[in-house]
Amino acid sequence: MFNAVVVRKSASNVSYKVEKVDESHLSKGDVLVKVVYSSINYKDMLALQYKGGVIRDYPMIPGIDFAGIVESSSNDKFKEGDNVLVTGYDVGVTHTGGFSEYAQVPGEWIVPIPQEMSIKESMVYGTAGFTAALSIFELEKYGMNIKSQPEILVSGATGGVGSVAIQILHKIGYENITAIVRKEKQIEIAKKLGAKQVIIIEDDNKPLKKGIFDYFLDTVGSNVTLYGLKRLNYQGVATVCGNVAGNSLNANILPFILRGIKLIGIDSVYVDHNIREDIW
C-alpha cells in the first residue's frame, strides 16, 4: 500500500484527499515509477474542481507530470534505478498521475532525465518549462535567432509558462524581451526574470496597431492573444499555448492578410516523442 491523492465525484461536488491505495488502483503500463516530484499546474487545479473540464472518469489520481526512479520495468528501454520523467499523454486526466508515491505508465511515454539534470530540477521545469521550451523551439523554427536580436513579446509573464519562457530566453542570449502583465506589482517581478520592458495590458478596439514585435510567445489566450497579434511586424510569428484568459478568440483578419503573420498552436500533451527528448 502507498499514499495517493484521489479525486472522487458525487452528484453535485468533487472531493479529494490522500488515500491508501495499491498497484491495482494504477492505470496500465509496463513501467512502474517511484515518484519523487510532481509539479503543480493550472490544469491540476482545474482537475480538482467540479465541472473543471479535465477529469472525465472518477475516481482518478491527478498530477499531469512526475519525475522519479524506475521501480520495475518490462520495457527494454528502461531498467530499475533509471531516473525518468513523464509529461502529457493525459497523465492525471484519463491515466492515473503524479500525485502519488507510485505511477505506472507505458514506456513510450517516458523521457530519460539528462545526466546533468537532477530529478528535482526536472520538475522545477515540469510541464510549464517544457511548454515554454517547446514554444521557443517553434519560434526559432520560424526564424527567431539570437544573432538578429529580434523584439519578442511574452504574455503571462509572472505565470508558470511565461515566467520560465522569459528566463530561458534571457539565459540563452535574447535581449529584447517585452513582458505583458496585468498589475503594477508584477512589473518588477517580470524585470527580475529577464524582461527588458514591461507592458500593462489595456483593451482596445482597433483592428490593427503599429507593428512593434517580431515574435510573440502567448501563454494566456483570448484577448491577450489578440493584443499581441495586432502588434506584430510584417511576417511576425506568434505561438499560443494557454487559455487562462478564455477559449474564444475574437480576432480580425487584417494582421494575417496585411502583414502575413503566422499563429502557431502549441500542444505539449501529444507532441512527438523525439521532439520531447530533444527539448529536455
Predicted segments, located by residue:
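Glycine-rich phosphate-binding loop and adjacent beta-alpha segment
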Residues: 223-280
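Glycine-rich NAD(P) Rossmann-fold beta1-alpha1 loop
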Residues: 129, 156-163, 221
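Short, glycine/polar-rich helix-capping loops at beta-to-alpha or helix-loop-helix junctions
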Residues: 99, 182-189, 247-253
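Adenosine-nucleotide cofactor-binding segment
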Residues: 154, 170-223
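Glycine-rich beta-strand-centered segment in the early N-terminal region that forms part
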Residues: 24-39, 51-91
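N-terminal Rossmann-like NAD(P) cofactor-binding module of classical short-chain dehydrogenase/reductase
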Residues: 85, 214-217, 239
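Residue-level marker of beta-strand positions
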Residues: 82-83, 102, 237
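NAD(P)H dinucleotide-binding glycine-rich loop of Rossmann-like/cofactor-binding domains
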Residues: 87-152
